[in-house]
Amino acid sequence: MPTSTAEQTVHTLEVRKTEEIMAPIDIVFETILEQMGPYNETPDGVSLKMKLEPWPGGRWFRDFENNTGHFWGHVQAIKPPSLLEICGPLFMSYPAVSNVQYRLTEEGGVTRVEFCHQAIGLIPAELRDGVNVNKGWGSLLTRVHEAAVRRFKA
């Protein structure tokens, strides 16, 4: 039986972003996989050493080698080239769970990426304000945009 209890409140977090990219949907989807995996980095350009196993149940994690790292989530759904969905704690070392979705559609040579990150749990205030979370996802989507356009023009 606990000797003391602290009041804990369950909070939510939501980030939604839309990106329109002048590149075919297949190229954009492949670029998302690369940017979520081996090319993932902080907004300051530091590698996050991420691995993404692109199949249902595949892991998404930071690989520090020698059997060390940080589990971020599992691939909940993957339907190339239109959907990537991941669930797990992501970057939070707190009792929380996240769902991240990339939904892609293509029309007239433009791929539209609808991004959504939703989380629920004991999320600390420094994450709930959304500043750093928005900065991180915004940076990743910018890298996806730039890399997909470069790839398409090559």
Per-range role (PLM):
Residues 1-47:
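Hydrophobic ligand-binding cavity/cleft-lining segments
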Residues 11-13, 56, 67, 96:
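Residue-level preference for beta-strand/loop junctions
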Residues 17-19, 102, 115-117:
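A structural signal for short, well-ordered beta-strand segments
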Residues 25, 45-58, 71:
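A solvent-exposed, acidic/Ser-Thr-rich amphipathic alpha-helical stretch
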Residues 28-32, 60, 75, 86, ...:
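Hydrophobic pocket/interface hotspot
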Residues 33-37, 44-45, 107, 112, ...:
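Short, contiguous alpha-helical
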Residues 50-51, 61, 65-109, 118-121, ...:
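Hydrophobic-ligand binding "helix-grip"
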Residues 119-154:
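A conserved amphipathic terminal alpha-helix motif
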